[in-house]
């Protein structure tokens, strides 16, 4: 039996916020630019080397079985300096979920909880840079 499902890449990462305007202001300050798409109850940024989408949805629309506290999968965004990014996030009101940890040569991770209860992972990933470079050469 062949696998007919092919995951081709992340298309949108969704966060929730009870105060959408405060979340928009916070993430706009973090990224240094405004969302590229907005509609009532939702806004979206395009980020990084692959222009991944990060959408923030009014928490009124969250599934009824959503956790009340941070939980679930952590999506890690590549950054060039984990410690500096971690400190910036904390200075903006995020709280520590996991301090920076070296996972091996060329791999450092950390994560915070944003002021709206979402886990935001950051990572320096040497493999990510190698893959990105190979894509540029192709």
Model regions and ranges:
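Conserved active-site tyrosine of GNAT-family acetyltransferases
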Residues: 23-28, 89, 117
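Short glycine-/small-residue motifs
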Residues: 119-122
């Amino acid at each position: 039996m062949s696998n007919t499902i092919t995951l081709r890449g992340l298309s949108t990462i969704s966060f929730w916020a009870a105060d959408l305007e405060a979340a928009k202001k916070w993430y706009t300050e973090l990224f240094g630019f405004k969302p590229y798409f907005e509609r009532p109850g939702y806004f979206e940024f395009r980020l990084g080397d692959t222009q991944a989408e990060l959408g923030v949805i009014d928490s009124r629309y969250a599934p009824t079985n959503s956790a009340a506290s941070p939980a679930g999968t952590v999506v890690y965004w590549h950054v060039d300096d984990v410690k500096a990014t971690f400190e910036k996030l904390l200075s903006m009101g995020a709280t520590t979920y996991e301090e920076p940890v070296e996972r091996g040569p060329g791999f450092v991770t950390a994560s915070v909880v944003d002021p709206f209860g979402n886990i935001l992972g950051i990572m320096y990933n040497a493999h990510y840079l190698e893959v990105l470079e190979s894509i540029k050469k192709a």
